[in-house]
Swiss-Prot record:
Its cofactor is Mn(2+). Its EC number is 5.4.2.12. The active site is at S59 (phosphoserine intermediate). Binds 2 manganese ions per subunit. GO terms for biological process: glucose catabolic process; glycolytic process. Pfam families: iPGM_N (PF06415), Metalloenzyme (PF01676). Belongs to the BPG-independent phosphoglycerate mutase family. This is 2,3-bisphosphoglycerate-independent phosphoglycerate mutase. The gene is gpmI. It comes from Helicobacter hepaticus (strain ATCC 51449 / 3B1). GO terms for cellular component: cytosol.
């Protein structure tokens, strides 16, 4: 049976209702699904997706798990284990790059959110290199998105506990500047200039500087890039390690630091660094990688392609990599018979300004693909997550309503054209917009999501994990489930 898989990013279950955008939204399609379509509850966090116990899930991990049909131990766990077992100091890429210079620059997101980085990794590398007699400069990127919006001072105190004679903080940038992924080079340039060139110097201590930004109403995500302590910038032949393990928001800043042919903005000077990256950020990057990606065979898309069936993958810009690269097990190029359609995300500063985003155009692409008879259609609706990240409850309610409207069209189209339909989420977000004290929550939730299965002759969907989605799709399509995959939900 031809099948549609809808991933409603950031829409999850919570029994708390007061600040629950899903609960408060007018959602006739979901009301219909709850009454008429079997569903199970799906785990999206912690060990169920290869993350540490209790760690919130995220879009990268979720889509890898959905598409591979198995639990892959994620980079966060792999790196943490290498630190725990004292193996990272002998990592070939780390040794290769850091032995080139007595000076090592470490750059990464300063939080324990575990989505892009972990402060434990940054601290461990700094301590190892310091013990080896290296002069270590820290370039800290403040978070405020995967963790509380004003939590940087806590993480600063933690990292300052390891700062000593040869470990010091050289720069601080909010992730809005240093971790863009949409080619907003004016932002990236500001971060680059503080990190590489020591521009925008301040005489304040890092703690005083962050507090001064708070006093101006500027919180962690948006801290203006600065340099500290007389840091004059990097010099040729120094070593640089970027410690984030998630690729999408690391590419741009690393590209402008390391690419001699970089042309997106005019660099005052190009510093020739010895660069290593924690994971593979881009297949075209020439830098040594501490933790190269694990090769994942027999993913959902690969199995469908191997049976010479046509498949269609679509999402907005913000989640396009998730329904292509991540869903396909970390593979850049499309499989034979796989078509990809990118719908541009709206060009707004934050998505609460346009909570519907471009959902209607994404819905149009799905309807068209169904009418064209694709054997498998997968789509991601970004609204619940991207608007959930803004912390704006009213906007998040509108985001859910926009997704619900498109789901209604897809349900109708699936029924009309005799498609099986799965609707699930990679993780939650918008169902908890504030905590009990009314503090804004911008992070993903630690909880379950629904998986609805509208399949001819199927009246029960079991509870399970994201790893059970791909085998369920293959079963609905009457295709063999490869031995690497886990069991289906029906």
């Amino acid at each position: 049976m031809k099948t549609i898989l809808v991933i409603t990013d950031g829409i999850g279950y919570s029994d708390k209702t007061q600040y629950n955008a899903f609960y408060h939204a007018k959602k006739p399609t979901y009301d219909y699904l709850f009454k008429n379509v079997p569903y199970g509850m799906i785990d999206t966090f912690g060990l169920s997706v290869g993350l540490p116990q209790g760690q919130m899930g995220n879009s990268e991990v979720g889509h890898m798990c959905i598409g591979s049909g198995r639990v892959l131990y994620q980079d966060l766990v792999r790196i943490s284990r290498a630190i725990e077992y004292d193996e990272i100091k002998d990592n070939p890429a780390l040794v290769e790059v850091t032995q080139q210079s007595a000076v090592v620059h470490l750059c990464g997101l300063l939080s324990d959110g575990g989505v892009h980085s972990h402060i434990v990794h940054l601290k461990a590398l700094a301590q190892i290199l310091s013990t080896q007699g290296k002069r270590v400069y820290l370039h800290l990127i403040t978070d405020g998105r995967d963790v509380l919006p004003k939590s940087a001072l806590n993480y600063l105190a933690d990292i300052e506990s390891i700062c000593e004679d040869n470990v010091s903080i050289a720069s601080v940038s909010g992730r809005f500047y240093a971790m863009d992924r949409d080619k907003r080079w004016d932002r990236v340039q500001k971060a680059y200039e503080s990190i590489a060139l020591g521009k925008n110097p301040t005489n304040l201590s890092p703690k005083e500087y962050i507090q001064s930004q708070y006093d101006e109403g500027i919180f962690d995500e948006f801290l203006t890039p600065v340099s500290f302590g007389g840091f004059q910038g990097m010099n040729d032949d120094e070593s640089f390690v970027f410690v984030n393990f998630r690729s999408d928001r690391a590419r741009e800043i690393v590209d402008c630091l390391g690419n001699p042919q970089f042309k997106e903005f005019k660099r005052e000077r190009y510093v020739k660094l010895h660069i290593a990256t924690m994971t593979e950020y881009d297949a075209t990057f020439p830098y040594p990688i501490l933790f190269p990606k694990q090769n994942v065979q027999n993913t959902l898309a690969e199995v469908i392609s191997s049976h010479r069936l046509k498949q269609f993958h679509t999402a907005e810009t913000e989640k396009y990599a998730h329904v292509t690269f991540f869903l396909n097990g970390g593979r850049e190029e499309a499989f034979i018979g796989e078509e990809r359609v990118l719908i541009p995300s709206p060009n707004v500063k934050t998505y609460d300004l346009q909570p519907q985003m471009n959902a209607s155009a994404v819905g149009d692409a799905v309807i068209k693909a169904v009418e064209q008879g694709y054997d498998f259609v997968v789509v991601n609706f970004a609204n619940g997550d991207m608007v959930g990240h803004t912390g704006n409850l009213e906007a998040a309610i509108k985001a859910v309503e926009a997704v619900d409207k498109e789901l209604g069209r897809i349900v109708e189209s699936a029924q009309k054209h005799h498609y099986a339909l799965f609707i699930t989420s990679d993780h939650g977000n918008c169902e908890e917009m504030k905590d009990e004290k009314g503090n804004m929550l911008t992070n993903h939730t630690v909880g379950q999501v629904w998986c609805f299965g509208m399949i001819e002759g199927v009246s029960k969907i079991e509870n399970g994990g994201l790893n059970n989605i791909a085998p369920s799709v293959l079963k609905a399509m009457n295709l063999p489930i490869p031995p690497e995959m886990d069991k289906p939900l029906f």
